[in-house]
């Protein structure tokens, strides 16, 4: 009992530290609210809550019982308003909404039962109901016997309190057929903050969700599925919802969406797949070339060219961290204008922004879009972006079940992910499947060896296809069997009738392709933690001891840490006294803490274990811990210790009293730096990135929020949860000298270059800073960090990023296609524009830094006044608004000897 009590005390202590209130049923969706122009007469919160209560089932063709649904007829049934009293929407709004491709409804929150006042065409197609059966009714008619009542309760609670919601629940079509619906609910408020409408966006995810398979557990109590898909789908849904919300807010500004191909990757025929033998990670032009059949592709691969345009809106923006903290940093402008393609020597003319435009802030842009636009996004691992037919099975679980299936495999076989996760692959067999070939596969599994065979398999509908199947075992670092990788290739179009099998030449070429795919899958899976690890072993690296590195081992912080460890205790949460919160992100928080009895201040990053598990970020957290342990550089943070609690993992690093560069930039006149200041900060970023690349680290999340300022004004790059760690490839480039230099006996020394050796293809980064090759899925190298440097320099000089759009899809389109322009209203040197232009080359091979790494950039004329070897000894240029240091003294005064409590309301 004593042990149990002690454990409870630990958990309670952790909860007191870290139990930040969530944003409601919708998690990250709570920020998606907008302010409308006009405020109709309102209704009480009770009416809104009532809108989501289940009613007795009465729909024809639907099984009775369970959660039930309302009537589908247009009579005066439950939840049905009379036809004459139905709320109306303006024709202008109808026209604007009809241009959207999303499936959604708009409900009137000011009327009892929140009746639907508009439903998109996609909603009728998805559900099978007619407009007459939908408009004027509450959405509960989609519920049925197996709809999760707990999820419905979450929706009801979100509606009652005027919050957003995003979750997956089982709904039913008019004919009674069930489908998985990813529902996103967002409130629309009037100028007084009262909810007047709700938007409910539906995305059918039956094909790709794990469904009830997420309840299947391994012996280690972790899910059978290697990837958790719900959070992936929620992230995509939230991005799509922004366009709907913006259209409701500003119907006049709505335009017909681009072609559907914007969101649909090109499908290749199997003949093309077998004919194209390019490697899976291939260099290519971000505008669409270089992909080949073997390239990674993303949902935005085939973006089509359209007229480049910028909205002439001004918008405020907030730091990704500070917006969640509630800090009032001030307004930032984002003024765009239609400009000609950028010519560095002669920047296109642009009218100077009018003061009233700069100061005006649109409610959506300022209050909602800003809450997530600067957050790092993690949309897919490299494994998920391999567009080939393959599965991964785990032989350590009985019956060797499937733990991962690619989207392409689902398309080929017609099965849903829910139907195959946790099952053995034998469901593909049928009447004409050769049992002798099946026996060969079974023997290869027993002997743990690879094999390539061809056999007849069957889709879910019974259609047979010739499957060129490659089985390859995957072993861990100890050489023990970990997984099997099974790659399929449909060769039905290449079967020779007389031989009743694939032609010899096709078989040879196809075998090469499936083996290459298996190798790429093998590499990609190794980025993820072993699914068979015990939960406590997942975080083992955070309990490892941290040893001081040479350059900082004698600084006061390390002396204080070692003094504490010399007492024989392992440092943990109890050794630190909370001072105040510094920031909060989507997976954790950062606190200013003091080491008990030392007076030394540190930054503590705390990450919620359950959130990391649900969002497929365990490997990200472990890689970040591994990277921190490698660093020993004045422009990078020092890791002093790390530990875990029952609910969190924590990193103790340097506290930077200068705060984020973002906040410093925001306080400057016009929200920009003078060029000498921008040059200094950019130069130190180059030095930091050069060091990271030398260690084999691709940073992947450079932005002002992740650049902290030390007390002396020098920078520290922080946050490595999206970084990629591989090996580096050092080499020396001999510089050729000109005749003039040879005559004067001035010889250039050789150049040392060390860049990460292995490309990656994870879809990670921050929306405005993501490089084109990340979006297209062509595979990326450390060159993406130099792209981000170009965006950073542009933002420091112009107060905005060059490719930002009104939503994520538009931003990504701009990154791939929009011309780079330089507003003439802000004076910037030609050298700066040339450097930005060179860094923002869409083809990575043409980008400055792609050949000799940081050396290319350091030699640019923009940095000619920088003394690179002595930059850490330089005094930073004076800012127009001086650096304001933060620390214990900035906390509101407390009584003597009284601990300053954490203000949990900040989160």
Curated annotation (Swiss-Prot):
Protein kinase that acts as a blue light photoreceptor in a signal-transduction pathway for phototropic responses. Regulates a wide range of physiological activities in plants that maximize the efficiency of photosynthesis, such as chloroplast relocations, stomata opening, and leaf expansion. The modification S-4a-FMN cysteine is found at residues 139, 425. Residues 89-162, 375-448 form the PAS domain. The active site is at 701 (proton acceptor). CDD domains: PAS, STKc_phototropin_like. Binds 2 FMN per subunit. It catalyses: L-seryl-[protein] + ATP = O-phospho-L-seryl-[protein] + ADP + H(+); L-threonyl-[protein] + ATP = O-phospho-L-threonyl-[protein] + ADP + H(+). Belongs to the protein kinase superfamily. Ser/Thr protein kinase family. SMART domains: PAC, PAS, S_TKc. Pfam families: PAS_9 (PF13426), Pkinase (PF00069). Its EC number is 2.7.11.1. Its cofactor is FMN. Residues 28-84, 332-363 are annotated as: Disordered. Residues 41-51 have a biased composition (Polar residues). InterPro entries: Kinase-like_dom_sf, PAC, PAS, PAS-assoc_C, PAS-like_dom_sf, Prot_kinase_dom, Protein_kinase_ATP_BS, Ser/Thr_kinase_AS. Undergoes a photocycle characterized by fluorescence and absorption changes induced by blue light. Residues 576-863 form the Protein kinase domain. This is Phototropin-2. PANTHER family: FLIPPASE KINASE 1-RELATED. ATP binds at residues 582-590, 605. GO terms for biological process: circadian rhythm; phototropism; stomatal movement. The PAS (PER-ARNT-SIM) domains are required for the binding of FMN chromophores.
């Amino acid at each position: 009992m004593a042990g149990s009590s002690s454990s409870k005390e630990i958990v309670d202590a952790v909860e007191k530290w870290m139990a930040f209130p969530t944003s409601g049923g919708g998690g990250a969706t709570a920020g998606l609210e907008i302010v409308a122009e006009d405020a109709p007469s309102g209704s009480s919160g009770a009416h809104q809550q009532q809108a989501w209560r289940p009613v007795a089932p009465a729909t024809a063709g639907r099984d009775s019982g369970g959660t039930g649904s309302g009537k589908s007829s247009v009579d005066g049934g439950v939840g049905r308003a009379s036809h004459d009293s139905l709320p109306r929407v303006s024709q202008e709004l109808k026209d604007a909404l009809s241009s959207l491709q999303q499936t959604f409804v708009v409900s009137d929150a000011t009327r009892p039962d929140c009746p639907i006042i508009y439903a998109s065409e996609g909603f009728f197609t998805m559900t099978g109901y007619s407009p007459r059966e939908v408009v004027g009714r509450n959405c509960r008619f989609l519920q049925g016997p197996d709809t999760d009542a707990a999820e419905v309760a979450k929706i009801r609670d979100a509606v009652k309190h005027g919050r957003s919601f995003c979750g997956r629940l089982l709904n039913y079509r008019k004919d009674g057929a069930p489908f998985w619906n990813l529902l996103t609910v967002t409130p629309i408020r009037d100028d007084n903050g009262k909810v007047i409408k709700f938007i409910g966006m539906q995305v059918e995810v039956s094909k790709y969700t794990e469904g009830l398979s997420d309840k299947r557990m391994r012996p280690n109590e972790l899910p059978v599925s290697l990837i958790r898909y719900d959070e992936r789908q929620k992230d995509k849904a939230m991005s799509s919802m922004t366009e709907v919300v913006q259209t409701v807010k500003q119907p006049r500004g709505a335009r017909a969406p681009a072609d559907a191909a914007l969101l649909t990757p090109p499908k290749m025929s199997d003949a093309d797949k077998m004919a194209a033998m390019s490697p899976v990670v291939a260099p290519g032009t971000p505008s669409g070339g270089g992909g080949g059949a073997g390239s990674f592709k993303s949902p935005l691969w085939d973006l089509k060219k359209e007229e480049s345009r910028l909205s002439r809106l001004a918008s405020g923006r907030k730091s990704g961290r500070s917006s969640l903290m509630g800090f009032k940093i001030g307004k930032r402008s984002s003024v765009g204008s239609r400009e000609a393609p950028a010519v560095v020597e002669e920047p296109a003319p642009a009218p100077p922004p009018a003061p009233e435009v700069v100061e005006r802030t649109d409610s959506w842009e300022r209050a909602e879009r800003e809450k997530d636009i600067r957050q790092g996004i993690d949309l897919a691992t490299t494994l998920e972006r391999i567009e080939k037919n393959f599965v991964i099975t785990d032989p350590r679980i009985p019956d060797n079940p499937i733990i991962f299936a690619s989207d392409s495999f689902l398309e080929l076989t017609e099965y849903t992910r829910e139907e195959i996760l946790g099952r053995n692959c034998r469901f593909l067999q049928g009447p004409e499947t050769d049992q002798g070939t099946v026996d060969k596969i079974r023997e290869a599994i027993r002997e743990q060896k690879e094999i390539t065979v061809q056999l007849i398999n069957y889709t879910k509908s019974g259609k047979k296809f010739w499957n060129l199947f490659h089985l390859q075992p995957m072993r861990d670092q100890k050489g023990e069997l970990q997984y099997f990788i099974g790659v399929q290739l449909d060769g039905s179009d290449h079967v020779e009738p007389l031989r009743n099998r694939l032609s010899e030449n096709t078989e040879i070429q196809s075998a090469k392709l499936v083996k290459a795919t298996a190798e790429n899958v093998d590499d990609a899976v190794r980025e993820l933690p072993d699914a068979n690890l015990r939960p406590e072993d997942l975080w083992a690296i955070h309990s490892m001891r941290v040893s001081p590195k040479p350059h900082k081992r004698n600084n006061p912080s390390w002396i204080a840490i070692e003094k504490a460890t010399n007492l024989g205790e392992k440092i943990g949460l109890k050794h630190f006294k909370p001072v105040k919160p510094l920031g909060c992100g989507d997976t954790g928080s950062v606190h200013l803490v003091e080491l008990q009895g030392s007076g030394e201040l540190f930054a503590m990053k705390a990450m919620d274990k359950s959130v990391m598990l649900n969002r497929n970020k365990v490997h990200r957290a472990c890689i970040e811990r591994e990277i921190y342990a490698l660093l020993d550089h004045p422009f990078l943070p020092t890791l002093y210790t790390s530990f875990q609690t029952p609910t969190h993992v924590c990193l103790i690093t340097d506290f930077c009293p200068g705060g984020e560069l973002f906040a410093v930039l925001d306080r400057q006149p016009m929200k920009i730096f003078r060029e000498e200041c921008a040059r200094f900060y950019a130069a130190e970023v180059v030095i930091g990135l050069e060091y990271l690349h030398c260690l084999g680290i691709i940073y992947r999340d450079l932005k002002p929020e992740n650049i902290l300022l030390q007390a002396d004004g020098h920078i520290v790059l922080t946050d490595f949860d999206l970084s990629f760690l591989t090996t580096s490839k050092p080499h020396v480039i001999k510089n050729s000298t000109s005749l003039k230099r040879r005559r004067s006996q001035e010889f250039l020394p050789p150049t040392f270059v060390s860049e990460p050796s292995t490309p990656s293809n994870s879809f990670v980064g921050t929306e405005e800073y993501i490089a084109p090759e990340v979006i297209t899925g062509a595979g990326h190298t450390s060159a993406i960090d130099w792209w981000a440097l170009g965006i950073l320099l542009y933002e420091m000089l112009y107060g905005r990023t060059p490719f930002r759009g009104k939503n994520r899809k538009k931003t990504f389109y701009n990154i791939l296609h929009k011309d780079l322009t330089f507003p003439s209203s802000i004076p910037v040197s030609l050298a700066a524009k040339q450097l930005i232009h060179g860094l923002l080359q869409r083809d990575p091979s043409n980008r400055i830094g792609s050949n000799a790494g940081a050396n290319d950039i350091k030699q640019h004329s923009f940095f000619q006044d920088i003394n690179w070897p002595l930059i850490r000894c330089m005094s930073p240029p004076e800012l127009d608004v001086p650096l304001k240091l933060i620390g214990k003294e900035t906390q509101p005064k407390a009584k003597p000897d009284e601990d300053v409590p954490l203000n949990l309301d900040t989160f």
